[in-house]
Amino acid sequence: MRPFFCAAFGAPSCMRAANALSGGMDYPDLSLEEAAQARGYTRIAGVDEVGRGPLAGPVTAAAVVLDLADLPEGLNDSKKLTPRRRAALEPEIMARASYAVAHASVEEIDHHNILRASHLAMERAVAALDPQPDYLLIDGNLIPRALHIPAEAVVKGDGRSLSIAAASILAKEARDRIMVDLAQQFPGYGWERNAGYPSKQHRDALIKIGVTPHHRRSFKPVHKILYQE
């Protein structure tokens, strides 16, 4: 059920009303943000990343501080939105929120590991926010070690917090654009459709065409092909 009645309820209450009618399972809300506000925090950022599973391309993170009184309608975990809806929400978030997007490169993924690279991207996104937040809601079960702002890790946070959901949308849209651009430079892998994830087309192209500079050599399917060569 899509929360179409936001205007009637008012932005801060919209998602809670939708959750109540849908059994409380379908949409993120402002519960975590409001709990942080109750503890005295005023500038709360949601942080999320995308691109941990692909065989190619960077990992991308976004940090978003929402105006809790002026929320875009229909915010949800980016994975639960259609590409068209994500694309429509991106400019709405950018117009109404403070945000930053950052990346960790394929080289950094291979040098460190995908978890550390994901945290690097998160750290960079948070550092780029101006003004800085005073509290962070971070998707996942770990807090990046270089973040020195009070924070909490939120498992499946993009389905629980509207701020994290907004970050997931910006990160997804930004990374998808990168992969579309790379697909034009390196045709045949289907990156414009699979975003670097190991689809059949991508795996077949790795065997037939080979490994590009944008592939993650530390990932087993890529490493295996390089080793065979």
Swiss-Prot record:
Manganese or magnesium. Binds 1 divalent metal ion per monomer in the absence of substrate. May bind a second metal ion after substrate binding. One of its GO terms (biological process) is DNA replication, removal of RNA primer. Its main location: cytoplasm. Its cofactor is Mn(2+); Mg(2+). Gene3D superfamilies: Ribonuclease H-like superfamily/Ribonuclease H (3.30.420.10). GO terms for molecular function: manganese ion binding; RNA binding; RNA-DNA hybrid ribonuclease activity. It is found in: Cytoplasm. InterPro entries: RNase_HII, RNase_HII/HIII, RNase_HII/HIII_dom, RNaseH-like_sf, RNaseH_sf. The keyword Cytoplasm applies. A divalent metal cation binds at residues 48-49, 139. Belongs to the RNase HII family. NCBIfam families: PRK00015.1-1, PRK00015.1-3. Endonuclease that specifically degrades the RNA of RNA-DNA hybrids. This is Ribonuclease HII. It comes from Ruegeria sp. (strain TM1040) (Silicibacter sp.). The gene is rnhB.
